[in-house]
């Protein structure tokens, strides 16, 4: 698959041949969905907590005598049915992470990239660099490229000026190639890869 390479200013900068093993697969939404669920589950903090009857502080004294009151028998004020009692089956601190094989994760990334390429949501630029970290200049460049909702992937090192200028633009994410992931690809309308990112991807899946 051949794709045109453009500059940030919108000028043509040649073309690039995309690997069919990475960008030419028939997209499978089920594999992509599995990876997205894995990512979202893994990043959940799991710090929710409610106190059970063994953890709340109430007196341990029997509420009232066993017989002769006409009421139901009760021994503890810590039980869930009373105000101030412990929560029954409440949330506990735990990990929400689920298992997903590494090969499935790698396959999901290739399917997400293929889906973007097939749907016309993939753009390749020669480099993502700015001389001065000016958000206004970058907004103008993005407007010329039609980027209002995009994930931009650079090489191993993201240009400091570019990252600084882009971080204040809504719906624009900038990541180094090490941070590329299925969820961020799916949630953004356009995927922008630099030539350095493209080379790193092909080396990764070689």
Swiss-Prot record:
Question: Which keywords does the record carry?
Answer: Ribonucleoprotein, Ribosomal protein, RNA-binding, rRNA-binding
Q: Which domain of life is it from?
A: Bacteria
Ribonucleoprotein found in the keyword field = yes
For the keyword Ribonucleoprotein, the answer is yes
Q: What role does it play?
A: One of the primary rRNA binding proteins, this protein initially binds near the 5'-end of the 23S rRNA. It is important during the early stages of 50S assembly. It makes multiple contacts with different domains of the 23S rRNA in the assembled 50S subunit and ribosome.
**Record's PANTHER family?**
50S RIBOSOMAL PROTEIN L4, LARGE RIBOSOMAL SUBUNIT PROTEIN UL4M
Q: Which SUPFAM superfamilies match?
A: Ribosomal protein L4
- Report the GO molecular function annotations: rRNA binding; structural constituent of ribosome
Q: What is the official name of this protein in its record?
A: Large ribosomal subunit protein uL4
Gene Ontology biological process terms from the UniProt entry: translation
Which family, according to UniProt?
Belongs to the universal ribosomal protein uL4 family.
Q: Which NCBIfam families match?
A: rplD_bact (TIGR03953)
Q: Which InterPro entries did the record assign?
A: Ribosomal_uL4, Ribosomal_uL4-like, Ribosomal_uL4_dom_sf
């Amino acid at each position: 698959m051949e794709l045109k390479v453009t500059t940030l200013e919108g000028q043509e900068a040649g073309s690039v041949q995309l690997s069919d093993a990475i960008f030419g697969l028939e997209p499978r939404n089920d594999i992509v969905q599995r990876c997205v669920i894995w990512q979202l589950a893994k990043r959940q903090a799991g710090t929710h907590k409610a106190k059970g009857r063994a953890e709340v502080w109430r007196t341990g004294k029997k509420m009232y005598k066993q017989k002769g009151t006409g009421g139901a028998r009760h021994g503890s004020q810590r039980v869930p049915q009373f105000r101030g009692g412990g929560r029954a089956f409440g949330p506990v601190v735990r990990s929400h992470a689920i298992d997903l094989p590494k090969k499935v994760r790698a396959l999901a990334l290739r399917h997400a990239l293929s889906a973007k390429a097939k749907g016309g949501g993939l753009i390749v630029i020669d480099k993502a660099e700015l001389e001065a970290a000016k958000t206004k200049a970058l907004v103008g460049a993005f407007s010329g490229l039609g980027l209002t909702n995009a994930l931009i992937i650079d090489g191993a090192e993201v240009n400091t000026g570019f990252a600084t200028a882009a971080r204040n633009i809504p719906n624009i994410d900038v990541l180094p190639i090490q941070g590329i992931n299925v969820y961020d690809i799916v949630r953004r309308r356009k995927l922008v890869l630099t030539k350095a990112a493209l080379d790193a991807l092909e080396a990764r899946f070689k």
